[in-house]
Each structure stands twice: as structure tokens, then as C-alpha cells.
């Protein structure tokens, strides 16, 4: 992409801002990280050290005052700030990327989408797990008909973290929009909708298991899709023995994949997309999933399938193209609203111990 890079203002420099958004923006041709907003002095120093040429501001108000100098706002601050910050950016005439979940409710997400449409501005949601290596591989296998007619999709995002970390993500205050249902659940629900389409019913169990915990830390969702596929989704911080990331069953074959996409770990370790001598998002052969059918107690049947490289950089590359009217919005707010419909139904299902029809 040629021409002057689009100038990006990034709000938030915690995990999402510093580990995911800032490195990916910096690695994207056509984008330039202009300003980082954080009120935390330690994070301000971190931002200056990691991005010496970038301005650091203490308040998002400094971005709105310079709206004519910026081309895109990225909201990577705590969940409860997503809606007010995205609204302020759109009202300032600036396109916006918002980290997931875009809002606490589907109604809020649709209101944001309406505002963006009214202003003629891009509003995109950062659902980076659409570019996980295992998810890209599974999409290809389904598209190629390798599994036949899929009837069951099992997706697990499990961790063993018996000790609480504290912070807003583990708060029991509904205003914080914390808990695993809205954190990791945003990913697994989005992936299920991308693969198998709209949902007609939701059953969920949401438990608080760790001592001192306030927010859900062990959650299960059972979705029935209009297509007939049933999705069983697990998100947990209390799993002492991890299950497969994916187990997908079809009329011809099944696909089982263990382990997590390597990109988050690489970003946390300081690796960057495009660095020489590395193949971004690749994993070793011993981690490949298996495709096929059988009853082997050791392998389950089938044979290893090469995992496609993960590609988080593809998200911001698509955003840059969309801002130049050269491609679609990679993740729309209305898509995110559909996922929030499911998450809200799951929360109600777990609270009332009922199956919720959508």
C-alpha cells in the first residue's frame, strides 16, 4: 500500500494495547502508531521505551482535540470504557477499532453500528482469534469438504490458573463486563458463528470456582445453530487437565487439535511479525492436529494435518484496506452484536437454569 501512512491513536496500554495492538499496528504497512493514551505512569514509560517516536498522552481528550491529525482510533482499554470511547471517537469524526467485546450488550453494539453508519465511518471489532492457526486450518478443512457434513463442534479455551490475578477482569461488578464468559467466551462464540452461522438456542452453565473469585471462571455453552450443527464451547481458568482446543465431528471424518495458536506467546515474548529468520504463526509438526476416522485409543484414527500459519497481522492489513475503500471491514459491529446476543442468552440461561431461544 503506497502513500502517507494512516495515523493511529491507541487508547489503553495494558495487555491488549501493549502486547497485541501496538505491535500489530507498527507491523502493518500503511499504518503508523501516532499516539498512545494511558494514565498509568509506568505504562507511559513502557510505551515511550517500546515506541520512542510515538506521542504519549494521559487522556483520550487529547486525541479528540487533535482529531484532524489522526485517521484511526483503537480502543484497547478496559471493557466498560469501550462504548463511551468508541462513541466519542465516532462523534469526533474518526474511524474506530474496538477490542472485543465491543460492548456489554448487543443493543449497545447496534447503537454504535448505527452511529458509525450515520457518520460514514468504519467501526471494526478486534476478533483476532479468527486468524488463529488452528481456526484457519479448520475453516479450510470444512470448505474443502474434508469432514463431510459437520454435526458437532467442540471448542475449548481452557487454562489452569488456580490463583487469582485480581483486576477488573475478575471483578463481580457487572459494570466491569468481566468474567470468562465475556472474555474468552467472546472468542469461542464468534468462531462458532463464523463457521456455522446463526444460533437458535443457547444453554449455559457459569460457575465461580476459585476461592475469593467474584466473576465466572468456569463456563460451558451449548449452542444449536440454524444449520443444525451443535456447538459445545468451554472456557475455564480451573481446568487441571486440558482438553483438545478443537474436536469437530462430521459425516466423513473428525478433526482434533490440541494446544493454542503460538502468536500470543510470541508477542508476549517480544517477537514481531516480519522479523527476519522467523515464519510468523507457524507451529512444529508435533503439534499438528489429526484428521480422519477410527477408534484407536492412542491416536483416535486418521493422520496428522499440517496447521496453516496463524495470521494476526491480516486483521490490521484488512482495516487499512477498508479505510482506503479497497476492501471490506474484517469484523463488523453487527457481527459482534450477534455474538453478544448469544453471550447475553448464555448469561440468562446460566442464571435461570433454562434453555434460551433466540
Pin down the residues of each PLM region.
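Contiguous beta-strand/loop segments that form the cofactor/metal-binding neighborhood of enzyme cores
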Residues: 190-273, 313-325
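Hydrophobic residues in well-ordered beta-strands that form the structural core
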Residues: 17, 58, 75, 98, ...
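C-terminal helix-rich "cap/oligomerization" subdomain common to oxidoreductases
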Residues: 1-5, 62, 72-74, 304, ...
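C-terminal glycine/acidic-rich active-site capping loop/insertion
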Residues: 28, 252-330, 334
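N-terminal Rossmann-like dinucleotide-binding module
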Residues: 1-51
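Predominantly a Rossmann-like dinucleotide-binding segment in NAD(P)-dependent oxidoreductases
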Residues: 129-212, 353
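Rossmann-fold dehydrogenase core element
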Residues: 111-128, 149-153
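Beta-loop-alpha module in the N-terminal Rossmann-like domain of NAD(P)-dependent dehydrogenases
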Residues: 54-115
Amino acid at each position: 500500500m503506497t502513500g502517507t501512512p494512516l495515523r493511529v491513536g491507541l487508547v489503553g496500554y495494558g495487555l491488549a494495547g501493549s502486547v497485541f495492538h501496538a505491535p500489530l499496528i507498527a507491523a502493518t504497512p500503511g499504518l503508523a502508531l501516532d499516539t498512545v493514551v494511558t494514565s498509568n505512569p509506568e505504562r507511559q514509560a513502557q510505551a515511550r521505551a517500546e515506541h520512542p517516536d510515538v506521542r504519549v498522552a494521559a487522556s483520550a481528550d487529547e486525541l479528540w482535540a487533535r482529531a484532524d491529525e489522526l485517521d484511526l482510533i483503537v480502543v484497547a482499554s478496559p471493557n466498560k470504557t469501550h462504548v463511551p470511547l468508541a462513541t466519542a471517537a465516532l462523534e469526533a469524526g474518526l474511524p474506530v477499532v474496538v477490542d472485543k467485546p465491543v460492548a456489554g450488550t448487543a443493543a449497545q453494539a447496534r447503537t454504535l453500528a448505527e452511529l458509525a453508519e450515520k457518520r460514514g465511518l468504519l467501526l471494526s471489532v478486534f476478533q483476532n482469534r479468527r486468524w488463529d492457526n488452528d481456526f484457519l486450518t479448520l475453516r479450510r478443512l470444512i470448505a474443502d469438504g474434508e469432514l463431510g457434513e459437520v454435526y458437532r463442534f467442540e471448542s475449548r479455551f481452557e487454562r489452569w490458573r488456580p490463583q487469582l490475578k485480581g483486576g477488573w477482569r475478575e471483578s463481580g461488578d457487572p459494570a466491569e463486563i468481566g468474567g470468562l464468559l465475556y472474555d474468552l467466551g467472546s472468542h469461542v462464540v464468534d468462531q462458532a458463528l463464523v463457521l456455522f452461522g446463526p444460533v437458535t438456542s443457547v444453554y449455559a452453565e457459569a460457575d465461580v470456582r476459585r476461592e475469593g473469585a467474584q466473576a465466572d471462571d468456569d463456563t460451558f455453552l451449548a449452542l444449536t445453530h440454524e444449520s443444525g450443527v451443535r456447538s459445545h464451547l468451554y472456557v475455564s481458568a480451573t481446568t487441571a487437565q486440558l482438553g483438545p482446543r478443537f474436536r469437530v465431528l462430521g459425516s466423513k471424518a473428525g478433526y482434533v487439535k490440541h494446544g493454542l495458536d503460538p502468536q500470543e506467546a510470541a508477542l508476549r515474548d517480544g517477537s514481531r511479525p516480519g522479523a527476519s529468520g522467523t515464519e510468523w504463526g507457524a507451529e512444529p509438526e508435533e503439534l499438528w492436529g489429526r484428521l480422519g476416522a477410527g477408534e484407536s485409543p492412542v491416536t483416535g484414527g486418521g493422520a496428522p494435518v499440517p496447521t496453516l500459519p496463524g495470521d494476526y497481522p491480516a486483521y490490521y492489513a484488512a482495516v487499512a484496506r477498508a479505510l482506503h475503500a479497497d476492501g471490506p471491514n474484517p469484523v463488523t459491529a453487527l457481527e459482534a452484536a450477534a455474538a453478544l446476543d448469544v453471550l447475553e442468552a448464555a448469561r440468562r440461561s446460566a442464571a435461570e437454569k433454562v434453555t434460551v431461544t433466540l
